[in-house]
Structure formats: structure tokens, C-alpha cells
């Protein structure tokens, strides 16, 4: 069982996701990557002061959204997001301030693993 401190009932998040997916379907999108902190909160309940690093919400046409961000911020996601903990994922600090690695490389691998390498 997931323990969360989300601001709204799950049914409200379900309503928001259904509304977003309807717009995605109309636009012909397979996935949406949401980076604005207020929109992340609107979809997932995520409430963290971590917007200074790469983070966002992956929303596909099925299943729970996935909060993706810095590994050290995952605990905040687990406390404030309504989703199952396996849908709160993080990237390592070796991506932060690196000249060799970029967090978007990690994001690309997660998208590819979900069959979205050629998604729209």
C-alpha cells in the first residue's frame, strides 16, 4: 500500500489525467513530458523545491504517470505523489553538473524502455 500526502483524492488526479489524455489523443501524442513544477503538481501532487535540476512527469496513454527527477528528490516524490513508488524514478548525481553526462540521457533510456523511442 502506498502512503501519500497528496493534496487531493485519487479520483481528482484521475479526472485531471483523463482530461490531459483526451487532449493528447486529439493532438496525436503517445506521451507527454511535463516540466513545469505547477503542472507536475497538478498531475501527480509532487511538491518539492527541486526545480533547479532536470525533472518532470512522463504521461502516456495508459498507466500511472511517472515522476522522474534527481535520485535525492525521490523521497519527496514518495511523500507527496499519489502514484505507486515504482513510478517515482530518479537519476544519479553523476549526471549533475557533468561535462560527460546529461540527465536527458537517463530520461531517453526510460522512454526507450517504455517503447517510446519513436513515439510522438
Labelled PLM ranges:
Residues 1-120:
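A composition/biophysics-driven feature that prefers long, compositionally simple stretches
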Amino acid at each position: 500500500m502506498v502512503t501519500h500526502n497528496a493534496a487531493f483524492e485519487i479520483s481528482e488526479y484521475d479526472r485531471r489525467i483523463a482530461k490531459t489524455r483526451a487532449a493528447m489523443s486529439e493532438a496525436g501524442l503517445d506521451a507527454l513530458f511535463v516540466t513545469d513544477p505547477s503542472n507536475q503538481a497538478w498531475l501527480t501532487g509532487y511538491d518539492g523545491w527541486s526545480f533547479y535540476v532536470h525533472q518532470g512527469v512522463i504521461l502516456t496513454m495508459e498507466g500511472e504517470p511517472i515522476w522522474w527527477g534527481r535520485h535525492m528528490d525521490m523521497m519527496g516524490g514518495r511523500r507527496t505523489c499519489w502514484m505507486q513508488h515504482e513510478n517515482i524514478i530518479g537519476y544519479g548525481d553523476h549526471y549533475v553538473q557533468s561535462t560527460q553526462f546529461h540527465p536527458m540521457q537517463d530520461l531517453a533510456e526510460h522512454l526507450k524502455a517504455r517503447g517510446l523511442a519513436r513515439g510522438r
